[in-house]
A protein has these predicted regions:
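Thiamine diphosphate
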Residues: 1-392, ...
Length: 392
């Protein structure tokens, strides 16, 4: 029986070298979901050998997760050639050309089938010696629905990227049904996977390229991205596109602003709420450190490593939250507040964790943020209370 199951080991093909950056200047207002869509256009142009290995998969949300440009260039996979009856319609933005060489697979409403397919596509490097770079997109609340089969695929050696977008209550203008709260915590707790929640387009570009570079190889790793449709002014991140900034982004976070001398309070934000965090810092004035978290997952690993658990590097903690700048900490995200609460343990500082603990509300974004107490005014109040308590 064993002989019948035996097979020759395939000659492995190394995955293509993934560039560190794509050279796009991220300016004006841009959401991370928009940056995600533009990423594929840039990848085809600047790194075609990488793009040739990319396979995207979506249930019924290819267009609404900004894969339209990629689909127009890569086509839909189909066993046989199919005619696109709307190809001559000038109002059709996405051309559903179906061919055996297509690199996007459309599944309909079937999230569990999607992640099962991601696992299989992500295992071709070990089974057939041919690495693929699979990326799946789903609305973020359905990450929970897809979690068990995707985690099983990761456990079995399938390396893939899952993008949950849009996410949080930031999509409140669309309604209350698709809001996600617990997914940041899911990302932190999933073995074999790194969770990312970038706030800015440049950070998304760097982290997604890095995630692609970790696929299709021994010792590789899957990735989960939590993105948003909320447009954010890119200038808020500063103009720093240096290698040092990139290393910090890939390590889990970086300072956007440092107070002169020791700060009175530190504000740490992640994802779509960074404009509110920075606005609050502007109101508070001098004496505030502002930190942009790109991966709570990596920072939590670093905290454990500093205590002697795991093999992760802990250097980012000294860069992001140095002991000589320890101050009361206010954390903010569009998700459950406990996902960033561990940061207070870095320097044993007082903590005020702000985030979303209820869902189902639809309305204007400013009103919804105020309702969930992740607006700038609430952040200012929390920072003042924390600072006063420390000085008192």
């Amino acid at each position: 029986a064993a002989a019948a199951l035996a097979r020759d080991e395939p000659e492995p093909v190394a995955p293509p070298a993934v560039p560190a950056g794509l050279g796009r200047k991220h300016r004006g207002k841009e959401s991370t979901q928009q940056a995600f869509g533009r990423f594929f256009v840039d990848l085809v142009h600047d790194a075609p050998e990488v793009a040739e290995r990319v396979v995207t998969v979506s249930p019924d949300v290819a267009s609404s997760t900004n894969l339209g440009g990629w689909i127009n260039k890569s086509a839909i996979f189909s066993v046989g050639e199919r005619r696109d009856w709307f190809a001559d319609d000038p109002q059709t933005l996405v051309h559903w050309h179906e061919t055996g060489r297509g690199r996007h697979i459309e599944l309909g409403i079937a999230e569990t089938n999607l992640v099962g397919l991601l696992g299989e596509l992500g295992a071709t490097w070990s089974r057939y010696g041919q690495p693929l770079l699979p990326i799946g997109t789903i609305y973020d609340p359905f990450v929970g629905r897809a979690l068990e089969p995707w985690s099983f695929g990761i456990y079995a050696g399938g390396q893939s990227i899952l993008v949950g977008t849009p996410s949080g209550v930031s999509l409140a203008p669309e309604g209350g049904a698709h809001q996600s709260i617990v997914t940041p915590s899911i990302g932190i707790g999933l073995p074999g996977c790194t969770a990312w929640e970038p706030a800015f387009g440049q950070d998304l570009e760097w982290t997604l390229l890095h995630a692609l570079s970790r696929l299709g190889q021994p010792g590789g790793e899957s990735a989960y991205f939590r993105l948003s449709t909320r447009p954010v002014e890119q200038v808020l991140a500063g103009e720093d596109a240096s290698d040092e900034r990139r290393r910090s982004v890939l390590a889990g976070g970086y300072p956007i602003r440092r107070a002169e001398g020791r700060p009175r309070v530190a504000l740490a934000g992640m994802g779509a709420v960074m404009p509110e965090v920075i606005e609050a810092a502007d109101v508070l004035g001098d004496g505030v450190d502002v930190l942009c978290i790109t991966s709570a997952d990596l920072l939590f690993r670093a905290l454990r490593a500093r205590a002697g658990f795991g093999e992760h590097q802990a250097d980012i903690l000294d860069e992001l939250l140095p002991a000589d700048r320890a101050a009361p900490l206010v954390t903010v995200l569009d998700g459950d507040p406990h996902a960033l609460a561990f940061l207070a343990a870095v320097n044993a500082t007082p903590l005020t964790p702000l985030g979303v603990t209820r869902f189902g509300q639809s309305g204007d974004l400013a009103e919804v943020y105020e309702h969930h107490e992740i607006d700038a005014e609430t952040i200012v109040g929390a920072a003042l209370d924390a600072s006063d308590a420390q000085s008192g």
